[in-house]
């Protein structure tokens, strides 16, 4: 039921009604939590649909400029998928969920939080690449240009990475393209 409660947010985000999208996702999270707890739901639904409500809440709250709600949702998005599932075929999107706090911290200029963020496991190259991106942005903002350059070089090393290029978010968005965009943004700064 939570997924149906969430779906209007797709319309709201496309029509600029970001706050309504935020409210729809808050209701969807509550609905899914009740459903998962009552039914002891396992499998695809709690791994993907439920965290997608938080993921979309991050997006709508970001677009309406609500940093507190956006960052809280980003952190919850990253906490929902179990680490053991991130490399399972078909569940690669969970790696993107784990990177969402880094995107949120960059968006809202939370430079100290980025620099305190623990380095992801090396067997998650997409998340590690985004970690280097976020760190490069933090160092640029703090005018630590030598350290920023080191992070950009590290980030660039993830371009044309077969593992990242083959990781598809929701089955159609290439994580490799997101890494390419991150490289361009960091270089542009």
Locations of regions flagged by a protein language model:
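Solenoid-like repeat scaffolds
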Residues: 1, 43-44, 78-89, 117-126, ...
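Hydrophobic, small-residue-rich alpha-helical packing segments that form membrane-like cores
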Residues: 1-4, 8-14, 18-35
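Alpha-helical repeat scaffolds
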Residues: 20-31, 65-80, 109-122, 145-160
């Amino acid at each position: 039921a939570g997924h149906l409660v969430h779906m209007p947010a797709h319309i709201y985000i496309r029509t600029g009604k970001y706050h309504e999208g935020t409210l729809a996702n808050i209701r969807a999270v509550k609905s899914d939590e009740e459903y998962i707890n009552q039914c002891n739901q396992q499998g695809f639904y709690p791994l993907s649909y439920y965290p997608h409500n938080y993921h979309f809440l991050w997006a709508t709250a970001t677009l309406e400029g609500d940093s507190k709600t956006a960052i809280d949702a980003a952190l919850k998005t990253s906490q929902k998928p179990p680490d053991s599932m991130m490399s399972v075929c078909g569940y690669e999107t969970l790696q993107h969920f784990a990177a969402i706090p880094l995107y949120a911290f960059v968006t809202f200029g939370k430079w100290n939080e980025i620099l305190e963020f623990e380095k992801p496991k090396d067997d998650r190259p997409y998340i590690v690449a985004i970690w280097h991106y976020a760190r490069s942005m933090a160092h640029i903002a703090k005018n630590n240009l030598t350290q920023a350059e080191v992070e950009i070089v590290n980030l660039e090393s993830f371009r044309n990475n077969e593992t990242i290029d083959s990781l598809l978010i929701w089955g159609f968005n290439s994580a490799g393209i997101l890494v390419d965009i991150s490289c361009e943004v960091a270089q542009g700064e």
